[in-house]
């Protein structure tokens, strides 16, 4: 992701999704071997031993993870895996993610940390963490919930995004804006991208 720093799995996954979509469009087989080998590593070597979730960050030689899994990165992992992994792995990761990272009170959303719930702190990727709730994790989880047809989860996440994001309306421009997006990684553009990740095959199904 950056020179001389750990490798972020979600950043790698964007590349994998791009190659996967290329193969879907052109069927050349040019990148199929690389895709297969990457996904095999993801399902075996790069899983967090404590949770079974895909790691958030790896050492530069891709041999082991450098930190505990986190809500913001895992939410993005799940949303991107929904595009390119086999259904069983994508669903299993999403179910594990929900089990470990859903925070039901005082506001429904995605927690940033498994082992702590800070009253308030700030993270460059997660944004302002309040009562342990991750703004980025909550927004990015919309993608997986939408793609996998988890409509109840999607609805509750959208309610939180609208409320906690502090939606403001510009009547002159006829637009809405998440004030939180001015200080957090995820604003309305990311939320729109995630909430419109519709898979036509799941429109009439629920997890």
Located regions from the model:
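CBM-like carbohydrate-recognition segments
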Residues: 90-207
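Extended ligand-binding clefts on enzyme/binding-domain cores
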Residues: 2-136
């Amino acid at each position: 992701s950056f020179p001389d720093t750990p490798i972020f799995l979600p950043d790698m996954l964007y590349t994998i999704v791009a190659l996967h979509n290329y193969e879907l469009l052109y069927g050349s087989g040019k990148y199929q071997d690389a895709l297969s080998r990457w996904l095999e590593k993801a399902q075996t070597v790069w899983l967090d031993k404590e949770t079974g979730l895909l790691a958030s960050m790896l050492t530069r030689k891709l041999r082991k993870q450098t930190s505990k899994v986190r809500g913001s990165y895992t939410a993005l992992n799940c949303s991107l895996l929904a595009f390119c992994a086999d259904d069983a792995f994508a669903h299993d990761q999403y179910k594990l993610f929900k089990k470990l990272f859903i925070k039901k009170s005082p506001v429904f959303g995605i927690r940033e940390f498994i082992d702590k719930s800070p009253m308030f702190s700030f993270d460059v990727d997660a944004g302002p963490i309040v009562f342990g709730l991750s703004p980025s994790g909550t927004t990015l989880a919309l993608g997986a919930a939408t793609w996998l047809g988890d409509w109840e989860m999607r609805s509750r996440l959208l309610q939180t995004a609208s409320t906690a994001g502090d939606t403001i309306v510009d009547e002159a421009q006829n637009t809405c804006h998440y004030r939180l997006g001015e200080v957090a990684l995820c604003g309305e553009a990311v939320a729109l991208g995630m909430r419109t990740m519709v898979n036509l095959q799941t429109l009439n199904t629920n997890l």
